[in-house]
Amino acid sequence: MTKQPEDWLDDVPGDDIEDEDDEIIWVSKSEIKRDAEELKRLGAEIVDLGKNALDKIPLDADLRAAIELAQRIKMEGRRRQLQLIGKMLRQRDVEPIRQALDKLKNRHNQQVVLFHKLENLRDRLIEQGDDAIAEVLNLWPDADRQQLRTLIRNAKKEKEGNKPPKSARQIFQYLRELAENEG
């Protein structure tokens, strides 16, 4: 028995199958280049980190070795090594690396903000005295009121006598210790 023309159409694969997973996503060449350039910048950012910060980022051994080599190389060789690091990053999941890098940056920003707040509080302590001490005691109940009063009195004398602000620095250090012990 021979197949009729209508029967052979049933054997053609893919006519009746509609699978969305097999859908091809078209990406422009420019977008691929932008992504590659972004990963190269990410690699350069990682290369610029110090050893302690680099330890906090999840890197495999090959990528870590390439980054350490790039840190030692100068000029044109460094550019080529950054290209290699970008290529290596394209083959890996970079989301954990980005998250760790953002965490490092954010920690630094939080520390800067905290220092500015402590500096402002120190300046208010020197200017306002007991009112600002009450604010400090509300923030940190275990703060030593007498030590703060002594440091403030000395800071005011140093300011009036145009002397170096040794006591003002001590107030800042004391406030920083209180903030660190709290969190």
Curated annotation (Swiss-Prot):
It is found in: Cytoplasm. Keywords: Cytoplasm, Ribosome biogenesis, RNA-binding, rRNA-binding. Member of a network of 50S ribosomal subunit biogenesis factors which assembles along the 30S-50S interface, preventing incorrect 23S rRNA structures from forming. Promotes peptidyl transferase center (PTC) maturation. GO terms for biological process: assembly of large subunit precursor of preribosome. The keyword Iron-sulfur does not apply. This is Dual-action ribosomal maturation protein DarP. It comes from the Bacteria. Its main location: cytoplasm. It comes from Escherichia coli O6:H1 (strain CFT073 / ATCC 700928 / UPEC). Belongs to the DarP family.
